[in-house]
Each structure stands twice: as C-alpha cells, then as structure tokens.
C-alpha cells in the first residue's frame, strides 16, 4: 500500500489565496453583448441593446414611415442543433436565433404593424468560452489596443531642434484632435491627423467662444496699467524701455481715442508693439487698460496674432475650407459639419472608458454618460500643453498598460455588427422611398444578409477568430487567455516598432513577459498572467498586498490597474516576509 506523502514547497511565495476564474473575462464579455438571459425591460444599454437603440428608429426622408425597435429575443435552435456536441458531429454551427420585435408606423394611413422579425443566427458561446463554427471549435482572441482618452507627448523637431508638445484627445469612434505647438510657438489644432488650424480659429468654430475678445477674457487677465508716474520718473530711452517691459506683447482692452481730434490712438484687441507704445508715449496717456499676456500664455497670444478671423462664422467657414477644399461653403453647412464631427454621439463617441481616462488625467468630474467633446475638455487640454511648454507636468508613455486596454469578444463583435446594421438601415431608407408605402411590412423592409455575412465572416475567417489549440488542456486554456495587438483597429506586424513589442514595467503581474511567439509576431501576442484580471473599462489589473508600518496584511488584497499604481512604492511578489507579515 502506498503511504500518503507530505509535500514540501520550496517556492518563495506562499499561497496567496484563490486564483481568479481563468475564463471570467471572455465569458462575461459575450454575456454582456448578448444579454440573452436578461428580461428585455431590464437590459443595460450595451452590446446588441445599445446597437439597436443607436440604429433605430429609422424614418423615411418624407417622414411618413417610421420603423422602431422594441426588444429582441434569442431562441435556441431546434434539437439536435441546440447541443454543442451534436453540432461538432454534424459539422454545424452552435447558434441561437435572433428575433427582433419591430413596430412600423405609417403616418399616411395611421396604420401600426408590430412584428417579430427573424434577423438570422448568432453563434453562442460554450461553457468553456469557445464557439463551434461549422463543426470546428474556435476561440476569439482578445485584442490589446490603444485606449481612447487623452495623452500628452513631446517630440523633437529635427529641423529646428525645438521640442514640440502635443495633447491628443482620442475618441473611441470619431475624429482625433491634436493640440500641438510649432517652431514659432503657435498653438495649432490638427483635426483627424490631417488638417491644421489655429487654436483660436478652432475655439470659435466649435462655439466655445464667439469673438477674439471672449478668447482674451478667457485666457488673459484684464489689467489697468498706471503710466502718469512713469513720465515723471523716467525720460528718453529709459522711459521707452520701461513702457516696453510693461506693455509690449499684451493687447489693448478698450479703444483709445484722441480727445481733441476723435481719432483712434489704438483699437481694442490690437497687439501692443513699438508703434502703439510710441503713440501712447506721444499722447502721454495717464493709464492703459490691457489684456496682460503672461509668458506661459504666449502660445495663445501668438495664435491670436496670426488669426485673421474675427467672428465664429468666419472661423467655422475657415475650418470647413480646410476639411473640404473645393466644396461650396455656407455658414449653415460649415456649422453642420463641425457639429456632426464633435457633438453628435453617433459620429463622435469617447465611450465610458474615454471619459474615465480624460477625467482622471485632467482631474475633472464630468459625468461618464457625457461621451462627446466638452468645452472643459478642450480648455483643460490647452492648460496642460501650456504647462508642458513651461517645463511643468509630465508626458505619457503610450506603451504603458494604463494607455492600452483589452477588447473582449463581445466588444469586437459589436463593432462588426454595428457596421452590418448601418448598411441595413441605409437599405431600409431606400426601400421606404422607392416602394409603395401601403404594402410595406417590417419583414419586406429588412434585408439582414449584410449583417449575417459580417457575423459569419467575423467567426469564420476573422483575424482574431482562431481554430482552438487542443493539444492538451493547458494549451487550450492558454489560447483562450491570449491577447493580441493585431487585428482590425490594431497594429500591423509590418508597422509595429521595437518599443511596442518590448516588455514594459507595467506588464508586471498583468502580462506574461516570457510567453510570446518567435518571428514577426514577437511581442505583439502575449498572455494574461495567472492573477491578471480585466476590469470594466478593459484595463488589466493585478492584486497587491497593502503594507502599513512595515507589515503586510494578506487579508487586504487590492486589484489595481497600471494607472492606479503610479506614485506608489511597489515591492516584488517574492520579497521575503516572515510569518507575522514583517519584511
């Protein structure tokens, strides 16, 4: 008979509690997308529910027809195809039927039709976080991509040798905004990484400020400079020098008139240069009201000096001409373009993660449901770029895991589905216009082929949908926890440089530094570490033990993301600690 053998562990790390569920993120991601087991009225606005709410209602161009979404249901397929093992044997896809309750309102005939429309089949996830597609078991690998939000960085202009400071507002969907300085110390805004406009033109175009005077009030202090005593105290070149130090580079706040002739000595908003100073001295003005430009505000003042637009109408037309050169422009069409670009949630979406990142980086508390650009976002970004120019603040490391997030299968599929639904909605609008509206039904309006083709393509031949490695149970588990920087919306192996592939200190406890393929994909494909978890925003967290007064409390374990561990002293997991928790 064999005796029970006592096992000894020679590892430095003692048992630190239960390991997390290894497939929790993958399963939750798809469950959140489908919300199959949730009653329609209790569903959260995410996944399929969010897509339907965004696409519907669909209205005809004349406003007579309106197709509304009520709810959706997912039904099991008939036996035997409702069983994953049977699907494997028969070479079929393990899926459910997506049925959507729609309401068509005909305002001309006052007729309302409510129907449950079959949208097609949607693959279901097995308990092991896999999909059975045409009899083969497949895994959708999670994607590591650049997080929406805000980043600040510094680049060297090789021609001038000067540092260029850039603040980027990156939305989840929509137009990128880059606030960058140039060789002349002017702050510009680059729209969608292509067209560059002056900061002050942009601020007026988006209606954050109406005029240059409003911009000056927003960024500069109004100050009355007393001059009478200077004329008595200083003379000649010395007086010129003092006036230049006090006034040059600022802006006149109010029109200055010659009381005898009624002529302008200087106009409001005029830059105070040598000529204006000469006029002030000649007329022996007792005081001058100015907008004082401090050294840190010089980049704003330089933008104003080069800005030829006076009102927001002129500014919005200039932005339109930069974005759509050659197109016929009116104030209304230009306003519509800018509004669609930054303030329409269907075109510009920061998502909850983007809003969270912006709030955290700029120390704001804008509600998370505000997913479009706000005046506060832009002004705080400008302030931070000013800080960087003046040697304050810090730039971001784009390879830090606080600036990279994981997209699970649910999020990846929702991007595909949204594309299919948009195509479908365009076809519905065309049918509403062309066909006889008295004979139309929800079924006849909808063509779900583009949607089904995209879903099939995603699971069948998508770059992140892979045939599961089944050589042993460990290989299977590793494949499901794999994270790839490749795929749609990610990096390409040809363009990815050394920095993005390299091991980063923020990977500690989050991504395995060893397990990565050799060859062209090195560093672009990795695996979640044993204790690594993905939080609701998609950032990878790892557990930490709190140390207070030199004592470790293993009952107080906190999961922190890479952004939350900044500014804290961190010791390695294998640091020697005695039985009482002392270092």
What are these regions (language model features)?
Residues 1-484, 529-583:
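N-terminal non-catalytic structural scaffold regions of very large proteins
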Residues 113, 482-513:
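Flexible, glycine/threonine-enriched loop-and-boundary segments that flank and lead into catalytic domains
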Residues 256, 513-514:
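Hydrophobic beta-strand positions
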Residues 515, 526-529:
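Active-site proximal loops enriched in glycine and acidic residues that flank catalytic Cys/His/Asp
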